[in-house]
Amino acid sequence: MSQEDKGFPAEVVEIIGRTGVAGEVIQVRAKILAGRDKGRVLTRNVKGPVRVGDILILRETEIEARKLKPR
């Protein structure tokens, strides 16, 4: 299996806010730790409990989440 088949580790560096109809999704900034985009910081949506320092396994590193709009 290649690295692309397993996923890419990313560390949560900042929690931006909550989104979704009931606030069930958390938007975070995550730094890619390995692979082609190592060192790049992405904005991603995460479902479930998460805190700064957690490691996420991302299937891909191309797509970023849309920015949260202030209300």
UniProtKB/Swiss-Prot annotation:
InterPro entries to which the protein is assigned, alphabetical: NA-bd_OB-fold, Ribosomal_eS28
A biological-process GO annotation: translation
GO molecular function: structural constituent of ribosome
An annotated GO cellular component: cytosolic small ribosomal subunit
Keyword annotations: Ribonucleoprotein, Ribosomal protein
SUPFAM superfamilies in UniProt: Nucleic acid-binding proteins (SSF50249)
Pfam family for this entry, one: Ribosomal_S28e
PANTHER family hit by this protein: 40S RIBOSOMAL PROTEIN S28, SMALL RIBOSOMAL SUBUNIT PROTEIN ES28
Protein name, entry field: Small ribosomal subunit protein eS28
Protein species of origin: Korarchaeum cryptofilum (strain OPF8)
Lineage, top ranks: Archaea, Thermoproteota, Candidatus Korarchaeia, Candidatus Korarchaeales, Candidatus Korarchaeaceae
Gene: rps28e
